[in-house]
Curated annotation (Swiss-Prot):
SMART domains: AAA (SM00382). GO terms for molecular function: ABC-type phosphonate transporter activity; ATP binding; ATP hydrolysis activity. It comes from Staphylococcus aureus (strain MRSA252). This is Phosphonates import ATP-binding protein PhnC. SUPFAM superfamilies: P-loop containing nucleoside triphosphate hydrolases (SSF52540). Its main location: membrane. Belongs to the ABC transporter superfamily. Phosphonates importer (TC 3.A.1.9.1) family. Part of the ABC transporter complex PhnCDE involved in phosphonates import. Responsible for energy coupling to the transport system.
Amino acid sequence: MSQIKFKNVSKVYPNGHVGLKNINLNIEKGEFAVIVGLSGAGKSTLLRSVNRLHDITSGEIFIQGKSITKAHGKALLEMRRNIGMIFQHFNLVKRSSVLRNVLSGRVGYHPTWKMVLGLFPKEDKIKAMDALERVNILDKYNQRSDELSGGQQQRISIARALCQESEIILADEPVASLDPLTTKQVMDDLRKINQELGITILINLHFVDLAKEYGTRIIGLRDGEVVYDGPASEATDDVFSKIYGRTIKEDEKLGVN
């Protein structure tokens, strides 16, 4: 059974723009699958449809054999609990401490009123500290999140997903705003948790070299359609040119500004 299954998935926006066209994909447990394509190709739409941040127009998406497309209420909450999300701009509460931001990964496990009051059980705090240690920022746990660098804030986001105990992590351009050194650190963290914990990673990346270095599988989107799906080791420059519809530029290969 695939961990994520897209079956005939399409998305049409109210203005008539087609975001996704008849997507059929199976993402297996433990994969590090990278979605690539030009801006507007449908990468974020595809990624965000998995946890229903974007609802699809037709088709169906399954998580471990259960339809998240048809899920509602408690069933949807429980399915989302298993799907961590990492955003390009971190999506942290800036004035809150690092620890409090990581603990927000536990909100799906407790009544809302307890979370509003910050009444997290001791076990949750232990999970949060363990997650921070795994991404090497445990020493920052009591600092305000906005006092940290961009790379450190993205590591808080990763720790939050780990604290959530997600079996799937969706990462939407997580290194787009980071410098090359910090990019490597964040990508190394994602690869480490993928390899050591078996967490499935589905990630959007802009840079070709990063996709080939870290991905086990490349999924190429062009105008909302899958135009390539195969091992990262077989994704040549010619393949990327097909995905992009033109020759790849040097700054798209190397990830430099």
